Amino acid sequence: PNGRITRAEVATIFFRLLTDDARQRNWSSENNFSDVSADKWYNNAVSTLCHMGVLGGYSDGTFRPNAPITRAEFAKIAVSFSQANGSAVYSYFTDVKTTDWFAPYVTTAKDSSLIEGYSDGSFKPENRITRAEACAIVNRVLGRKPSKNHMKISGRIDWPDCTTADWFYEAIMEATNSHTYQMGKRV
C-alpha cells in the first residue's frame, strides 16, 4: 500500500472504471506520445483517456508511463475523470500556491472531498502518491464509502501488509472485496 504507482497503472485503473458506453464512445488506440507505442499493454487506456481529456503528457512529447505519479498529477486525473466542477482557486494547503499549474485541480478535488491533506496543513503535491492514497481517492471518485459492516463479510480478502491499525485499511478493504455496488451506494 505504501509503494508507488506508475502513470501507466493509473491510466489503466481509470480506463477500467469507464462505463462500457463511455469506453466505446471514446475508444482510441492512437496517441502522440513518443513513448507509448501501439503494442504496449497500456496503450488503449492512455490513448482513450487522453482523447477524453482526462490524461495528458509532458511538453517534450512523452507520457512517461513507467514513472511514478505525483499527488498533484493524480488530483488532476481524479478531477478530470469525475468531471467535478471547480470554483475559484483557493489555497487550502500551505504548499499549494494559487499560481501552481495544479492549484485549480487540487482546489476542486478538495471542494469535492476527493482529497485530503496532511495533519501539518500540507498537500505535498510533488510527492509520489502511494497505492493506498490512490485507492482512497478512487473510492471517493466512485462515491464508495467504506462500511464497518462490509469489513465483517464472510470470505473477505485480507492483505498481510494492511492491518486494522492502518489509516487506509477500510479503503483497501472496500476496493478489494467483492460486493454489489451502484454509484454512491451498496445494493
Residue ranges and their predicted role:
Residues 1-11, 16-43, 52-72, 80-104, ...:
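Feature responds to low-complexity, polar/acidic, surface-exposed segments characteristic
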Residues 131, 135-138:
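Alpha-helical membrane segments in multi-pass integral membrane proteins
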